[in-house]
Amino acid sequence: PINTDGVNFYENNLEVSKATLDQSLTMQRSLNIKPELEASSDSDLKEKLLNHPQKDFWHEKMIWYGPSGIGTARSLEGFIDHHQLPFRKTFKERNYWELGHYCELGDGKFSLTAGWHSIQAVYGSNDWLGYNSNKNKVTMRVMDFYHHDEGKIRENWVPIDLAHILSQIGVDIFK
């Protein structure tokens, strides 16, 4: 984490731990609001995402750390431009909650949610990672590690099993 307090050997305040986890879960629930279903253009969708309820949870200096192939994004606008916009355009048909992040942990200023599999979706366009759409149903193995600072989510590390997703759309990266 940017403030180097990621490793500690003491018990954290349970109230703070519960609050950080609650903040992460509430933000994640807001992600199921899907402005991409009504957007008329990329710029319209970007504007809708900039004003989406998620904005209330992210720190103004947020950093989103995605896996190789997606990369890192700074600020809500960077996150929208480099991950959310392509992801939402590709996976318009998705369900975060049927499988869900069933592992949930709050520990001081840090929280974790994960599910192996955690998201179901339909691969609907080539906007995310550039592979042609085949309308295949996919499941995603995703973990979210959050660092909370100044009452907001400051950092988010998101390992996504891209090899697993690619194999479900017919791309074998191991050949």
Features from the language model and the residues they span:
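C-terminal and inter-domain tail/linker signature
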Residues: P1-K175
